[in-house]
């Protein structure tokens, strides 16, 4: 049985996900899932699982304060021999701080700690959870690993045991690798732009190679957004900066992504001479397809850039909440350019 602690008393998930509301409703009606706003409900639980999304600021810097706040509210009620699992995104080194925090704030508490980073994707979170390619369990406790294997027993995938620090770095490395793949695609796209080649044809050749593969992140977009990839890149850079270790590849990935987002204004200014007084229509407002969230979405960042150059912007999106056109034809009326 699962009890969710939810201070805001949400009756629906804060982010819409396919199948999620149905899954919640089914398990509530069958008595396996309850929600409370009382941290005292932790008292009889064998496992405390912290899953809050770690917020990032406008510079993609992560803030783990929410994780420590939740721990502090829960600690007085934890029973002995509890298993504490964190799946929120943590900069490497945070698990060590969490363990020390618990020992100081609740001296005498017997507990095991696991860092098991989530690997969900907005718009496909339920499917990702039930069909993972692997589960990473970062812990120094053999007992904790056995318990995690029992929890994940229904999942048909490898369960990888490692230290909490290795699990933290694995999460950073995965997103850094994906971001680096995208940055490579941006560079090749620039080559195509200057040589008359078609980046989509080049991409077909790349993904047909078994050493690269059809799932490779090679979309020649205007850059990655949403804060997820940037959060891990910045976390690695910040940690290594403290040790005076340079990471030129990862640093260049962040710079390329920033430069890439400016490409839209460069191209449109080249076409029109100036964007002042121009009407630009953007098709799609959300962070990615399949979700209504606007958090750090690329279209909204592009909108802000275009308006900064004096353009007016209309946006079409049928799912996003806000002042957006729900008719693509209406949104396109009078537009000097359409971005999709």
Where are these regions (language model features)?
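Structural/interface elements that position substrates and couple domains in central-metabolism enzymes
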Residues: 1-340
């Amino acid at each position: 049985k699962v009890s969710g602690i939810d201070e805001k008393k949400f009756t629906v998930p804060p982010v819409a996900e396919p199948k999620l509301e149905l899954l919640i409703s089914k398990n509530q009606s069958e008595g396996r899932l309850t929600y409370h706003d009382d941290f005292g409900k932790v008292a009889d639980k064998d496992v405390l699982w912290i899953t809050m999304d770690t917020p990032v600021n406008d510079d993609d810097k992560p803030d783990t304060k929410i994780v420590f706040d939740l721990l502090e509210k829960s600690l007085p009620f934890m029973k002995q021999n509890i298993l504490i699992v964190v799946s929120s995104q943590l900069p490497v080194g945070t698990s060590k701080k969490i363990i020390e925090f618990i020992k100081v704030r609740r001296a005498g508490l017997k507990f095991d700690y696991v860092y098991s980073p989530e690997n969900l994707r907005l718009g496909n979170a339920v499917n990702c959870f039930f069909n993972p390619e692997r589960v990473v369990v970062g812990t120094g406790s053999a007992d904790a690993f056995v318990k995690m294997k029992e929890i994940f027993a229904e999942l048909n995938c490898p369960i990888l045991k490692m230290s909490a620090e290795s699990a933290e770095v694995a999460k950073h490395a995965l997103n850094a690798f994906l971001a680096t793949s995208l940055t490579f695609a941006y560079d090749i796209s620039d080559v195509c732009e200057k040589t008359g080649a078609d980046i989509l044809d080049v991409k077909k050749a790349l993904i047909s190679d078994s050493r690269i593969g059809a799932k490779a992140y090679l979309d020649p977009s205007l850059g990655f957004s949403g804060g997820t990839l940037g959060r891990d890149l910045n976390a690695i850079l910040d940690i290594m900066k403290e040790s005076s270790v340079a990471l030129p590849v990862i640093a260049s990935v962040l710079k390329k992504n920033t430069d890439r987002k400016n490409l839209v204004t460069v191209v449109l200014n080249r076409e029109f001479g100036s964007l002042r007084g121009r009407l630009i229509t953007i098709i799609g407002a959300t962070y990615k397809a399949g979700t209504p969230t606007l958090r750090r979405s690329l279209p909204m960042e592009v909108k802000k850039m275009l308006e900064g150059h004096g353009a007016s912007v209309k946006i079409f999106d049928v799912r996003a909440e806000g002042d957006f056109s729900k008719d693509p034809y209406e949104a396109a009326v009078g537009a000097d350019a359409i971005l999709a």
